[in-house]
């Protein structure tokens, strides 16, 4: 998996603050300087004022201003299972690598056993891995080796069958039906800062599946560089709380 910040609103926290101050200003924020807009906010410098205002907004549940700052992420190599989970979220725009127009006829099926094309879950590589809804708390070495081999055999066979169907003239849009839900996909997705916090509330939580949790954590790391005061406050004061931010 690889996650990159593809594009994002410049000076996002200036924009958040301008939008928030607009609600309480008798002068349009479009006709005055940022310094004038922030004049009544506590702080000795503009950076302190931004920190004060952003903390106040998040602490009091005034999330609307955070919808003005937008970020676009490029995600490479997550499973179709992870894609199905993240695309359930509203107010996020997606473009997804197509399996109708992109075929995988040149992939070596044996390489699939080692992570090519199909995501390998930790439970197929780590005998001590404990996952949600697992039927057995622990497994023997023999059981682990057997399940790891079954997993690798199955995905290798699926890719071989897919490629055979292509060779027999089946269109990629139909041949893809035999590929596993772990097949890797690339995604471009855009969301505002408020929505990213909501996604993190749901998908960085301990009860989220390991893959989408890892993806979300990487997005949060990138967001911390892009929108630092907002996501520092989120990490310290909001992340993991029971009252999750509504979409």
UniProtKB/Swiss-Prot annotation:
UniProt: dUMP binding residues: 85-88, 98-100, 176, 203
Cofactor note: Binds 4 FAD per tetramer. Each FAD binding site is formed by three monomers.
EC main group: transferase
Superkingdom classification of source: Archaea
Keyword NADP part of the UniProt annotation: yes
EC number annotated for this UniProt entry: 2.1.1.148
Biological process terms in GO annotation: dTMP biosynthetic process; dTTP biosynthetic process; methylation
Span of the annotated motif ThyX motif: 88-98
UniProt keyword terms in alphabetical order: FAD, Flavoprotein, Methyltransferase, NADP, Nucleotide biosynthesis, Transferase
Subunit structure: Homotetramer.
Listed HAMAP family: ThyX
Biological role: Catalyzes the reductive methylation of 2'-deoxyuridine-5'-monophosphate (dUMP) to 2'-deoxythymidine-5'-monophosphate (dTMP) while utilizing 5,10-methylenetetrahydrofolate (mTHF) as the methyl donor, and NADPH and FADH(2) as the reductant.
Protein name: Flavin-dependent thymidylate synthase
Provenance organism: Haloarcula marismortui (strain ATCC 43049 / DSM 3752 / JCM 8966 / VKM B-1809)
